[in-house]
Amino acid sequence: MTMTMNKDSLALIKQSIKTIADYPKPGIMFRDVTSLLEDASAYQATIALFVEKYQGMGFTKVVGTEARGFLFGAPLALELGIGFVPVRKPGKLPRKTIAQSYELEYGMDTLEIHVDAIKPEDKVLVVDDLLATGGTIEATVKLIRQLGGQVEHAAFVISLPDIGGEKRLAGLGLDVFALCEFEGE
């Protein structure tokens, strides 16, 4: 986080995120980013702080992961004046795609991207709402790199540092940034 970021804005963002105990299963503290979206001031502050962080860094595309990554990635791309690329679950993108599977806590999942969405000259910023294990973003980064895109940065509204996603993504050579952290799951 840069020193110029407004502490009041960061506090507003963190306070707007509701925590739901034992959802979706017992023992989980679910961080509900939809409550942030309901607060126009908090949502605007979120996008403004991302713009402050990433403006002027030469990105040519923002990639957002399904589905909440779209809610932060698309407005950020507009503010930066660059294109937005969605990474989606299988069968949701109409043109030719490539796919990357990844492990979930109990099973596997797959993400897809259009084969023509990223070019080798693209410098890509990956955006999602929450970083936990890092599996979704790792799969996203693999897709971008398979298409030749350059990706070294990933931005999140929330990070759960105890779960290990930051370390996992650092192992991929990513600079990880989150507006707020919550301890525990």
Curated annotation (Swiss-Prot):
Its EC number is 2.4.2.7. Pathway: Purine metabolism; AMP biosynthesis via salvage pathway; AMP from adenine: step 1/1. SUPFAM superfamilies: PRTase-like. GO terms for biological process: adenine salvage; AMP salvage; purine ribonucleoside salvage. InterPro entries: Ade_phspho_trans (IPR005764), Adenine_PRTase (IPR050120), PRibTrfase_dom (IPR000836), PRTase-like (IPR029057). It is found in: Cytoplasm. GO terms for cellular component: cytosol. It comes from the Bacteria. It catalyses: AMP + diphosphate = 5-phospho-alpha-D-ribose 1-diphosphate + adenine. Keywords: Cytoplasm, Glycosyltransferase, Purine salvage, Transferase. PANTHER family: ADENINE PHOSPHORIBOSYLTRANSFERASE, PHOSPHORIBOSYLTRANSFERASE DOMAIN-CONTAINING PROTEIN. Catalyzes a salvage reaction resulting in the formation of AMP, that is energically less costly than de novo synthesis. This is Adenine phosphoribosyltransferase. It comes from Shewanella denitrificans (strain OS217 / ATCC BAA-1090 / DSM 15013). The lineage of its organism: Bacteria, Pseudomonadati, Pseudomonadota, Gammaproteobacteria, Alteromonadales. The gene is apt.
